[in-house]
């Protein structure tokens, strides 16, 4: 199956003109009940989509059900768009009220004339990112917007109303994406399916426009002739996918990439995907970090299945001070977010250990002894029975910068983190060091991937 | 024409001595009636009658696209209501229609009581007595109206609670639009101030209106001793609680008579501080048979302006004038009574309380025999000394009285009303008259469409030249078209 995305439609300015035309006719449609407050039609002054809207197909499924043609998940994004509309409103609300109520009960007001204000509303730098489910069926196209991220700057010529209008707009956006847009798209697509190939419009001005729609619609349904127009590269790819499936080989067809199709994951590449899930060692591996030969973490461990790999940082990473504490904390919180799929508001419980220096005179004697003392002190503070910190001594590191990171109760293998701090400065100031860990994570928690806030770095 | 029920309402106010000229709602009534008069928009027929002295019925038909109408009932326990109500054959035209409102300067009754005692006429005394009567009887009015086929209901209750207060309840219930509106008015009239508290269920509208009458003290600049002007200042405040829409306005009204001709003139200036509207009106009764009004609107914020003109031309019954005068008692018994009573009452009312009622004083002096001779002489000397100014007062009063008498006594057969507005480009035309016991009003509203068609032709200029000439000729033929046309018949017994 192939698609043709006609970029030329968006290339020139005619696209913006078309949107402006459609928008102004839709806003001024006579079928809609005109509000009393509006004293003139709504005029769409300017529409500007400087960039081509991006459409990314995340998943596509051709179901063999009788009527449905295709089902897919798409990511639509649109950037830096601009829209300006202008109208005239009645500011005297009492006058509107006076006109609504019968004159018998309405007390007559003196000098209660109409006072109209022209109002211009500008929506600038509109950024839309939405993940949609698309169902192409025979009568029409159904779209549901799942994860909509819309942001725009709003500017109103009447400054008093700006905050109110903005608040109401943001409230109503929910309805627009949930209700208005899907029904609109469905209705227009129904036209495409039913009136295919015939231009039944009566308005001469719109005939050309309508014709464009019908020619576009031809590409929606596959005909036998369409197969001839498919690109050879796509056909080659498709055939390779098919062949890889038919061989039942567990090795992927392409060695260096996760998937043949960008954005799609195949079963035989799952372990790679899992191996790049954000755990501490994976995160490390995703960086192009030159692995030293003498590393305790072998490269073999990276491709190990998830259930046997441990969520730990190699010692070399810590030694070379590639990570600071903030990065580790970030990874940990992301891990927590993934595993904790049920409630979003749960915050990771962190165990903070303050390592305040309570130096006894004996501690000042030698560096090595001090290190041992510190680590044991930590152990006594975090007195969880499962946790088995194995402190390792390192001669080079300053005394109270050696600490352990415990992430999971089960998988904890404590590592030392050597932070790249000036030891002299710290000793002089006696700055307390905060120990941050994450605990009580159940490994059996269901992991979820795809379509989350931060998709896995498998590109 | 005033609808029959409005005439009954007016009679109710008259019989219960409730003055309508003090209401802030009616502060611009003169210019409103001269500029924004209502034009019937269909063929309309109203038949009304007074079934008993206290009940009134009215039946309305109107045909626009289909026949619809209404049925209204009114009951009031006010006494002497029949004295103020007349059927359509007897009612003078100037009472049956809304026209220039002649105001009577408000007198402070507590101050003026000493003067009015000596007055030979008793009408003011009666009014005063009724107002301060301890045996004030609570009067009320009940009104209901049903429209068909839409089956909407209108209801109104007016209750006079005390000599100074009045309560009014108006309600509309529409079955089709599921619209129910109730509006309450509480009015308190202390002659110098009229305060109104209003609450309406539509939009939970709350309102307060106040009108203050400044006492007409003789000013230093006033060369005229006979003070007949009145100055009123009013304001209103509104707040719709649901939509939080505020509204307010303030208005100044000055009413006086021209000293030379005795003709009344009204000036108003109103200002809406929220929306910046300023509107000033000047209305004058230029003669017994003509009235003019000009109104200028201006908006402070948008610099929009509008100029409106309105005028009335009354037509008298020219022939048979002599016979009418002879048979005046027969034809117009109540108007004759009005002619007798009203000028005198007006005279005493117009007279300022600070100026002693010289007319009566002069009359009283010869009749009072117990005054000693030297005092009589002193009085005569005083009268002689101030005779020039007294004569001036008398002259002024007589001119005003003469003019009022002239208007009240003349029998008008019809009136033409015209009004136009420069911005809206409309011309309203209304004819009202009496014909065989029917009160007829017929009118139309013309809209000038020249500007609109010119813009159309400008658009068509791009297409071809032939259409331009075609539209031009059309423009020449029909620059206006009627937006409204209607005729209304009223008959009441």
Swiss-Prot record, chain A:
Present with 377 molecules/cell in log phase SD medium. Residues 338-347 have a biased composition (Basic and acidic residues). It is found in: Mitochondrion outer membrane. GO terms for molecular function: lipid binding. Belongs to the MDM34 family. Residues 348-359 have a biased composition (Basic residues). Its main location: mitochondrion. It is a multi-pass membrane protein. InterPro entries: Mdm34, SMP_LBD. The keyword Membrane applies. Lacks alpha-helical transmembrane segments, suggesting that it resides in the membrane via beta-sheet conformations similar to those predicted for other outer membrane proteins and porin. The SMP-LTD domain is a barrel-like domain that can bind various types of glycerophospholipids in its interior and mediate their transfer between two adjacent bilayers. One of its GO terms (cellular component) is cytoplasm. GO terms for biological process: mitochondrial genome maintenance; mitochondrion organization; mitochondrion-endoplasmic reticulum membrane tethering; phospholipid homeostasis; phospholipid transport. Coiled coil: none annotated. Ubiquitinated by a SCF (SKP1-CUL1-F-box protein) E3 ubiquitin-protein ligase complex containing the F-box protein MDM30. Ubiquitination is important for mitochondrial integrity. Component of the ER-mitochondria encounter structure (ERMES) or MDM complex, composed of MMM1, MDM10, MDM12 and MDM34. Residues 1-190 form the SMP-LTD domain. Keywords: Lipid transport, Lipid-binding, Membrane, Mitochondrion, Mitochondrion outer membrane, Transmembrane, Transmembrane beta strand, Transport, Ubl conjugation. The lineage of its organism: Eukaryota, Fungi, Dikarya, Ascomycota, Saccharomycotina. Component of the ERMES/MDM complex, which serves as a molecular tether to connect the endoplasmic reticulum (ER) and mitochondria. Components of this complex are involved in the control of mitochondrial shape and protein biogenesis, and function in nonvesicular lipid trafficking between the ER and mitochondria. MDM34 is required for the interaction of the ER-resident membrane protein MMM1 and the outer mitochondrial membrane-resident beta-barrel protein MDM10. Residues 338-375 are annotated as: Disordered. This is Mitochondrial distribution and morphology protein 34.
From Swiss-Prot, chain B:
The keyword Coiled coil does not apply. Pfam families: MDM10 (PF12519). InterPro entries: Mdm10. The keyword Transcription regulation does not apply. It is a multi-pass membrane protein. GO terms for biological process: establishment of mitochondrion localization; mitochondrial genome maintenance; mitochondrial outer membrane translocase complex assembly; mitochondrion-endoplasmic reticulum membrane tethering; phospholipid transport; protein insertion into mitochondrial outer membrane. It is found in: Mitochondrion outer membrane. It comes from the Eukaryota. One of its GO terms (cellular component) is SAM complex. Keywords: Membrane, Mitochondrion, Mitochondrion outer membrane, Transmembrane, Transmembrane beta strand. Component of the ER-mitochondria encounter structure (ERMES) or MDM complex, composed of MMM1, MDM10, MDM12 and MDM34. Associates with the mitochondrial outer membrane sorting assembly machinery SAM(core) complex, which consists of SAM35, SAM37 and SAM50, to form a SAM(holo) complex. HAMAP family: Mdm10. Lacks alpha-helical transmembrane segments, suggesting that it resides in the membrane via beta-sheet conformations similar to those predicted for other outer membrane proteins and porin. Component of the ERMES/MDM complex, which serves as a molecular tether to connect the endoplasmic reticulum and mitochondria. Components of this complex are involved in the control of mitochondrial shape and protein biogenesis and may function in phospholipid exchange. MDM10 is involved in the late assembly steps of the general translocase of the mitochondrial outer membrane (TOM complex). Functions in the TOM40-specific route of the assembly of outer membrane beta-barrel proteins, including the association of TOM40 with the receptor TOM22 and small TOM proteins. Belongs to the MDM10 family. This is Mitochondrial distribution and morphology protein 10. It comes from Saccharomyces cerevisiae (strain YJM789) (Baker's yeast).
């Amino acid at each position: 199956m192939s698609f043709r995305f006609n970029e030329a439609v968006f290339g020139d300015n005619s696209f913006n003109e078309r949107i402006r035309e459609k928008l102004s006719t839709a806003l001024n449609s006579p079928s809609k009940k005109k509000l009393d407050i509006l004293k003139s039609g709504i005029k769409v002054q300017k529409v500007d989509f400087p960039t081509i809207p991006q459409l990314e197909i995340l998943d596509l499924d051709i179901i063999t059900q009788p009527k449905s043609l295709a089902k897919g998940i798409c990511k639509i994004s649109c950037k830096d768009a601009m829209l300006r509309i202008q109208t005239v409103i009645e500011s005297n609300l009492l006058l509107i009220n006076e006109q609504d109520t019968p004159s018998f009960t309405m007390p007559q007001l003196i000098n209660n004339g109409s006072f109209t204000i022209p109002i211009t509303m500008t929506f600038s730098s509109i950024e839309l990112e939405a993940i949609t489910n698309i169902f192409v069926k025979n009568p029409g196209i159904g779209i549901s917007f799942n994860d909509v991220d819309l942001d725009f700057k709003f500017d109103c010529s009447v400054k008093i109303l700006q905050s109110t209008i903005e608040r109401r707009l943001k409230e109503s956006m929910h309805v627009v994406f949930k209700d208005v847009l899907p029904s609109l798209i469905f209705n227009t697509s129904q036209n495409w399916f039913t009136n295919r190939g015939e231009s039944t419009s009566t308005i001469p001005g719109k005939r050309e426009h309508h014709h464009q729609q019908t020619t576009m619609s031809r590409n929606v349904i596959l005909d036998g002739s369409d197969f001839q127009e498919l690109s050879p590269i796509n056909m080659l790819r498709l055939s390779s996918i098919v062949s890889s499936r038919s061989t039942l080989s567990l090795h992927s067809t392409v060695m260096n990439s996760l998937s043949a199709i960008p954005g799609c994951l195949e079963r035989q590449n799952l372990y790679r995907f899992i191996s790049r899930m954000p755990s501490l060692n994976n995160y490390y591996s995703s960086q192009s970090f030159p692995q030293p030969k003498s590393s305790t973490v072998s490269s073999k461990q990276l491709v190990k299945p998830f259930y046997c790999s441990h969520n730990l940082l190699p010692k070399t990473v810590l030694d070379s001070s590639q990570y600071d504490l903030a990065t580790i904390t970030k990874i940990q919180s992301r891990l927590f977010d993934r595993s904790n799929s049920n409630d979003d508001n749960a915050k990771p419980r962190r165990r903070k250990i303050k390592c305040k220096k309570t130096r006894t005179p004996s501690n000042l004697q030698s560096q090595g002894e001090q290190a041992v003392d510190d680590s044991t002190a930590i152990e006594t503070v975090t007195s969880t029975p499962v946790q088995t910190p194995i402190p390792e001594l390192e001669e080079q590191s300053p005394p109270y910068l050696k600490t352990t990171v415990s992430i999971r109760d089960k998988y904890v293998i404590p590592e030392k983190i050597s932070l790249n701090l000036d030891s002299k400065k710290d000793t002089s100031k006696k700055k307390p060091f905060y120990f941050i860990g994450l605990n009580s994570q159940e490994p059996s928690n269901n992991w979820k991937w795809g379509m989350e806030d931060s998709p896995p770095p498998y590109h | 024409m005033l609808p029959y029920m409005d005439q009954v309402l007016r009679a109710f106010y008259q019989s219960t001595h409730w003055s309508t000229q003090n209401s802030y709602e009616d502060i611009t009534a003169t210019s409103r009636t001269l500029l924004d008069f209502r034009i019937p928009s269909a063929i309309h027929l109203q038949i009304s009658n007074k079934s008993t002295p206290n009940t009134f019925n009215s039946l309305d038909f109107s045909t626009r696209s289909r026949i619809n109408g209404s049925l209204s009932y009114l009951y009031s326990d006010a006494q002497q209501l029949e004295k103020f109500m007349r059927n359509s054959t007897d009612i003078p035209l100037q009472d049956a229609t809304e026209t220039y409102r002649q105001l009577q300067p408000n007198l402070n009754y507590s101050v003026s009581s000493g003067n009015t005692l000596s007055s030979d006429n008793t009408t003011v005394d009666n009014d005063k007595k009724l107002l301060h009567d301890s045996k004030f009887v609570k009067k009320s009015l009940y009104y209901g109206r049903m429209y068909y086929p839409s089956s909407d209901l209108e209801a109104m209750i007016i209750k006079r609670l005390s000599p100074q207060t009045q309560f009014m309840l108006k309600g509309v219930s529409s079955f089709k639009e599921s619209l129910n509106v109730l509006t309450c008015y509480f009015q308190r009239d202390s002659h110098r101030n009229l305060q109104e508290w209003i609450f309406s269920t539509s939009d939970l509208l709350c309102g307060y209106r106040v009108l203050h009458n400044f006492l007409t003290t003789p000013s230093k600049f006033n060369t005229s001793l006979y003070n007949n002007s009145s100055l009123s200042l009013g304001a209103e405040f509104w707040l719709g609680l649901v939509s939080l829409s505020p509204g307010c306005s303030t208005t100044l009204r000055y009413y006086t008579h021209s000293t030379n001709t005795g003709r009344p003139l009204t000036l108003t200036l109103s200002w809406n501080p929220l929306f910046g509207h300023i509107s000033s009106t000047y209305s004058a009764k230029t003669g017994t048979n003509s009235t003019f009004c000009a109104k200028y609107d201006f908006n402070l914020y948008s610099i929009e302006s509008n100029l409106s003109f309105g005028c009335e031309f009354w037509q008298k019954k020219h022939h048979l004038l002599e016979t009418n005068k002879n048979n005046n008692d027969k034809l117009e018994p109540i108007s004759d009574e009005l002619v007798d009573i009203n000028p005198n009452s007006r005279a005493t009312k117009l007279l300022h309380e600070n100026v002693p009622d010289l007319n009566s004083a002069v009359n009283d002096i010869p009749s009072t025999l117990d005054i000693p001779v030297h005092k009589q002489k002193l009085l005569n000397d005083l009268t002689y000394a101030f005779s020039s100014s007294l004569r001036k007062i008398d002259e002024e009063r007589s001119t005003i009285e003469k003019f009022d008498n002239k208007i009240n006594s003349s029998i008008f057969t019809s009136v033409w009303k015209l009004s136009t507005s420069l911005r809206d480009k409309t011309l309203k035309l209304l004819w009202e008259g009496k014909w065989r016991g029917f009160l007829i009003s017929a009118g139309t509203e013309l809209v000038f469409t020249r500007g609109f068609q010119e813009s159309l032709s400008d658009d068509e200029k791009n297409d071809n030249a032939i259409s331009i000439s075609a539209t031009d000729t059309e423009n020449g033929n029909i620059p206006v078209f009627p937006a409204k046309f209607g005729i209304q018949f009223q008959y009441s017994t």
